[in-house]
A protein has these predicted regions:
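Active-site-adjacent helix-turn-beta-strand microarchitecture at beta-sheet edges
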Residues: 66-69
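Helical "lid/coupling" subdomains associated with nucleotide-phosphate turnover
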Residues: 1-2, 7-59, 74-212
Length: 212
């Protein structure tokens, strides 16, 4: 079974696309709601039961960056205390940037401005008196990013400083350089910086020490 999420939910031609997928591949793609999508994502994270339960004993933010939106969920001592969906998907951000012809450095600044503006209210409402130690990143782009984060062996996390160094390097790359370094096509290469920006800016505003 295949699922489609935010980008397909909001597409005006979603029925045509789904029909074409069915005709060409035989796959029946089901468009699921935001709550269904998050349930599946969190179920996957929680499948590592021992490690997950240990992590969320301390303040933890789970950040799920999709193509159309991003979901931030805060956990504290095993309990979900807040969750918010925001229009910070990598494809949505890339679409906004495409309207503004800027340099490589300018891309980073514009993305961060968009992300920060969306996070202002969330920070005021949910982070004022809350300590976040861990940030768990999930989503469409996370595997490509984690492969280049220098994680070795059976480890599944890096500290905040390592994440920032990685983000700085990524933000200085051209699309061609990202294609070559990450082994992706140009369409996907365009999405990696927006996704990394969302993870890194949320890492900053929460003050989390570790990125999982």
């Amino acid at each position: 079974r295949a699922y489609a999420t935010t980008a397909m939910r909001e597409a005006k031609n979603s029925r045509i696309i789904l029909d074409q997928i069915r005709v060409r591949t035989g796959l029946e793609v089901h468009i699921i709601s935001n709550s269904e999508q998050r349930f599946i994502s969190y179920k996957a994270v929680a499948s590592k039961a021992g490690e997950f339960n240990q992590i969320i004993q301390k303040g933890t933010a789970i950040v799920d960056v999709g193509f159309g939106s991003a979901q931030i969920s805060l956990f504290d001592k095993d309990s979900l205390v807040a969750t918010q969906n925001m229009p910070l998907g990598s494809l949505r951000l890339r679409s906004q940037l495409s309207k503004i012809p800027v340099s490589v450095e300018g891309n980073r600044l514009h993305i961060e401005e968009i992300v920060d503006n969306e996070l202002i209210t969330f920070r005021k409402m949910y982070l004022r008196d809350r300590q976040i130690t861990n940030l768990i990143g999930i989503g469409d782009n996370i595997l490509y990013l984690m492969r280049r984060l220098g994680i070795k062996g059976g480890e599944s996390h890096v500290d905040a400083e390592t994440m920032h160094v990685f983000y700085d390097k990524l933000s200085q790359m051209t699309i061609n350089q990202i294609e070559e370094n990450f082994g992706v096509n140009s369409d996907y290469a365009n999405l990696l910086l927006p996704a990394a920006a969302v993870y890194t800016r949320i890492l900053d505003i929460t003050g989390a020490e570790m990125f999982w």
